[in-house]
Amino acid sequence: MRSNLSVGLDAGKALAVAWDVPVIGVHHMQAHALTPRLVSALEYRSSSGPDFPFLSALVSGGHSMLIESTGLADHKILATTGDIALGDCLDKAARAILPSHLAVPPYGRALEQFAFPAGASDYNYTAPAKRDAELARRVTKWGWGLGAPLAGSKNGSSSRKMVYSFSGLLSSIERFVKYEYDHQNSTISSQLRQPGELSDDERRDMAKEVMRVAFEHLASRVLLHLSSLPPAEAAKVKSVVVSGGVAANCFLRHVMRAFLDIRGYSHVELFFPPVELCTDNAAMIGWAGIEMWEAGWRSQLSVRPIKTWSMDPSASDGGILGVEGWLKV
């Protein structure tokens, strides 16, 4: 990836020299967070909202983080994944769950389409009204049930940590696919499922459940943060951006809205970019560059691709503006 970025950056710097125009380096995840502001500009709204401060859940195959954005380059990381990203979890779950003829990329989209062939009319989803219902394991008609990530820790202490964890969820669904369920002892057996034993109906329930549990886990950290704020501070947060490749999932959008509504945050507006702007795209990079330009920032021609670059000003590298190569004009 770094070599690809080097080629693109060098080409951009060459064009900047040839055309005698400035070059502006862009943080990839900053661009995702600012995408709804691009959408507002494209729709010719009077305000390029959402207005700061707002929260962003940035979810893709490589990232899962919740950030608080108080300014163009001021993004505090509130929660991030302790193991694998949400998109990675769903891709691997799809490859395990889907019938072989349907297991084609993009896997996350294939999983959603398989789970909900009729779209939103298939959702039949009710968000948990209370925390204990959120953490409870919902047993399916097949006997198995997926537990909420981090809910099984001693005394439930980890269930309130501001961290995401999707590896356990993936491991559980892979076991359910591979091994028969022992109904007598209410546990997964060591007996391998026979070829063709896993019906499409059970596969579809697996697809629905792995997405439901994953998306509720994502939403739960938004609620934990909002509930931790003093009322006056919580009132300032009027928007939550959900961006990145996984944000294209329509069921995620439904779960996030239902989750906030039933837990007393119906006033918080959710911003989801159009599907075509959820995955990595040039438009979001260009827009982030425009916003940095208008704020007076330029990059020196000596800048190079950065392998690890935090968004958070409190990080060891100083965040977006903490790295070398910026010029303020």
Model-derived features with residue positions:
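Glycine-rich beta-strand-to-loop/alpha-helix junction loops that act as flexible
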Residues: 1, 15, 60, 239-249
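Short beta-strand-loop/turn "lid" adjacent to the catalytic site in phosphate-handling enzymes
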Residues: 1-12
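Conserved phosphate-binding catalytic cores of ATP/NTP-utilizing and phosphoryl-transfer enzymes
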Residues: 17, 21, 26-54
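Conserved phosphate-binding/catalytic loops in two-lobed NTP-binding clefts
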Residues: 25-26, 256-285, 299-303
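Short beta-strand scaffold segments in enzyme catalytic cores
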Residues: 34, 56-58, 64-68
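Glycine-rich phosphate-binding loop plus the immediately following alpha-helix
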Residues: 70-129, 166-181
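A contiguous, well-structured pocket-lining segment that forms one wall/lid of small-molecule binding clefts
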Residues: 113-240, 249-261, 321-322, 327-329
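Acidic, glycine/GT-rich loop-and beta-edge segments that sit at the periphery of enzyme/chaperone cores
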Residues: 292-329
